[in-house]
Amino acid sequence: MKEAVKTVKPKVPAKKRIVTGSKTKKKVFVKKKPPAKKPPDKKPLKKTTKKTVKKVINRPKSIHIPNKDLKIFKWIPTPKKEFTEIETNSWYEHRKFENPNKSPIQTYNKIVPVVPPESIKQQNLANKRKKTNRPIVFISSEKIRIYPTKEQQKILQTWFRLFACMYNSSIDYINSKKVVLESGRINVAATRKVCNKISVRKALKTIRDNLIKSTNPSIMTHIMDEAIGLACSNYKTCLTNYIEGQIKKFDIKPWSISKRRKIIVIEPGYFKGNSFCPTVFPKMKSSKPLIMIDKTVTLQYDSDTRKYILFVPRVTPKYSVNKEKNSCGIDPGLRDFLTVYSENETQSICPIEIVVNTTKNEYKKIDKINEIIKTKPNLNSKRKKKLNRGLRKYHRRVTNKMKDMHYKVSHELVNTFDKICIGKLNVKSILSKANTVLKSALKRKLATLSFYRFTQRLTHMGYKYGTEVVNVNEYLTTKTCSNCGKIKDLGASKIYECESCGMYADRDENAAKNILKVGLKPWYKQK
């Protein structure tokens, strides 16, 4: 008898009953395959943006350095003192107080003028380009005014217009070659080809010839070539400023034909017989004789003043001068334009009250004209032009007064001192709209004094007469005691009274002494 074979049933997952009335249904759970994973959507790559990192300036807690280390006297005058006035032959005041225990000053010979480093760089590049070994010289421009007749003025005005047209057409040609791309990058290969005045001259030959033929008497071809060269050089400088980050957006604008100041550039070969371009202008009256001109000259016309001025570059020969070993510190401010401190004397130059009184009438007229322009917007074009010309006239009067003071003061300082340490005043942040602490009247005073222009003129005069000018940061110069180094918040007080050493002095003179000490530090670098 055969044995029964046991059949083993496979295991089935648990059953679930769903009751629907009387009937029952069995539902079996079956394992489902997991759904196929979809590939992730490709997102557009984000452009990597450079994070702007703020520069952390590690400023020292104290700027004090002992007087012994710099071999400076402790002397500083008290606030109550009698000044002696210096003759200025101008509208401003210049007062001086001498040290009673004055020490003798040593003298030495120095060869002047000193060529500035930027000028040395440019002259070396010119020597490399022209393959010459010309000596490096100090170049300064001389102003010569010319007095053309009415017929000569008409010819010159057409020449100014043609020069501007040639300049604009050459800039349009360079822009068409797409030197700067839309992304902001610079096409270096295109710049080498395009920003070359010879290649631009060849491309714009027909335009140049048509412009020359359009006038009678015709303008010289070399003057038109100078316009092309000027456009190329301006384009290059704009590119370098954009690369170095000095300007945020690259934008070189064409000249408007009706602009205030118009120029033409004239080669030295056209100057003959006390005139230029003798075939067109056989006789030309001038304030100085037009002789010994060996460099390119620019002729400028100002429509407001109606003056024709030639800017002639001249080489100043070197000579030796006896200089005194005497250094000073200068604190620019709002009470006095400049406060000067040296071991033998202190000076206060031009109190702010005198500046207000001298520019009072000009600013009254400026405010009156501005009110007329604001209250009456529907003025005629002729009336508007007249008012704007009046505004420029009174602004020019103020700038001329400041210019006179700047040059006379800088000339006197440069001749008395061999090293000048001047405080670097950040006028831009003070005059900004964000600064609500200062009133508009104070901001106007600061703008009229124009400290930045004064430092520029002082440095130029320093190179000319062999005086070193150092710009010093004014950080903690007013708060620090120049004798012991204690820091104190002064607020609005005009006098610095130290509690630790008992020094009693004017706050501006104390700051000027600190500026001098910081400038004389051996490790200090000009920033």
Curated annotation (Swiss-Prot):
GO terms for biological process: DNA recombination; transposition. Zn(2+) binds at C481, C484, C498, C501. The keyword Repeat does not apply. One of its GO terms (molecular function) is metal ion binding. The keyword Metal-binding applies. Residues 21-36 have a biased composition (Basic residues). Residues 21-50 are annotated as: Disordered. Keywords: DNA recombination, DNA-binding, Metal-binding, Transposition, Zinc. It comes from the Viruses. NCBIfam families: guided_TnpB, IS200/IS605 family accessory protein TnpB-like domain. In the central section; belongs to the transposase 2 family. In the C-terminal section; belongs to the transposase 35 family. PANTHER family: PTHR36172, RESOLVASE-RELATED. This is TnpB-like protein R854. The lineage of its organism: Viruses, Varidnaviria, Bamfordvirae, Nucleocytoviricota, Megaviricetes.
